[in-house]
Amino acid sequence: MKTAYVSATIVTLNEQNEVFENGYIIVEDHTIIEVQHGDFFKHDQVDEVVDLKGKWLLPGLVNTHTHIVMSLLRGIGDDMLLQPWLETRIWPLERQFTPELAVASTELGLLEMVKSGTTTFSDMFNPIGIDQDAIMETVRNSGMRAAVSRTLFSFGTKEDEKKAIQEAEKYVKRYYREHDMLTTMVAPHSPYTCSTEMLEECARIAMENNTMVHIHLSETEREVQDIEKQYGKRPVEYIESCGLFKRPTVIAHGVVLNENERTFLAEHDVRVAHNPNSNLKLGSGIANVKAMLEAGIKVGIATDSVASNNNLDMFEEMRIATLLQKGIHQDATALPVETALSLATKGAAEVIGMKQTGSIERGKCADFITIDPAKKPHLQPAEEVLSHLVYAASGKDVSDVVINGKQIMWNGECKTLDEERIIFEARRYKHGLQM
């Protein structure tokens, strides 16, 4: 089926960063087959014409690191540093999770992402007490594109660790699909929660199954000091010695990196998921994204979980990301709007290995969102589209969401997720947690 979306301002995020005023795109099944100015196609050659009436059309946003199973933990443990936050609030609460609660929490995260314009995401979930197959089915039913990864920890006995590795390997073999809508990565939590043996086993699983790796790394000064004290190496060098960087790897955070480490990461195709709001809220610091990009590192913007953010609004992340770089470098040209948009779309898609999405171009997957600026004073005058998307817009402005050619949300109404039921169940299950 061919559908033409017409009368829109098209923000392509292609190599030339072209913006087509009064443009159109044609989608055939799941794929964009034409992007142009004006209305120069034969209407009898398409099955449906959708008039967007002046809306802005742009690539769906790509969240490179989050934890949607934690969505019910929003607002838990505010104003705490990372380590005590994890040890005294998050992990104890996650041990109370049931399969039903985890699904309700996941649905809440999916709903929030769709309504705020995210079409693709990379996730890590703690498998304790949950049904991983139910989580994957829930994501699949939402219509979103995702890499959903089972997190590994070295908690408990050596036998517990061995079982965790076996279960993770089964999960990877079951769900890894290179070009599917739903895939996975090998996801050891971090160098401070995984033993050397577990990290080496994760490297083996990734190599044998040709998967990517997703890990928290160099997030805080404390982490760097602790790993250096324990292993005689900084986190980047230590993880490299475990073999994980033999496969394309996404490190979440990368707040505490020196120049040599940035050069090393670029040379080994290690990508960074940048979580500006989460890093600020947990007092972890500010990642030097400008230096990363100059070193040649692929960077994608991310939200982290709602427990440390406290939302999944990628527009907000774009804005704070660019403002932070301008501020810490005292350079107003640092991370300009075009770059910020790329780090939340095309660049982010490359970070998580999904080059089939992230821009409005012929041959790309039909993943896009729209915003109607007409009745929004904060988006007027409407001519400066790129500026407004980064510095003025929010996820609440999103009108329509199309993923893989399918209308997932239209005029603010979700078609694959029951908003009323999801919010009701989220409230019900939250009351069951012993805070």
Swiss-Prot record:
Cofactor: Zn(2+)
UniProt keyword Hydrolase, yes or no: yes
Pfam families tied to this protein: Amidohydro_1
Keywords: Hydrolase, Metal-binding, Zinc
Domain of life, per lineage: Bacteria
The protein's role, per its UniProt record: Catalyzes the deamination of 5-methylthioadenosine and S-adenosyl-L-homocysteine into 5-methylthioinosine and S-inosyl-L-homocysteine, respectively. Is also able to deaminate adenosine.
Protein family membership: Belongs to the metallo-dependent hydrolases superfamily. MTA/SAH deaminase family.
Protein name as annotated: 5-methylthioadenosine/S-adenosylhomocysteine deaminase
Gene responsible for this protein: mtaD
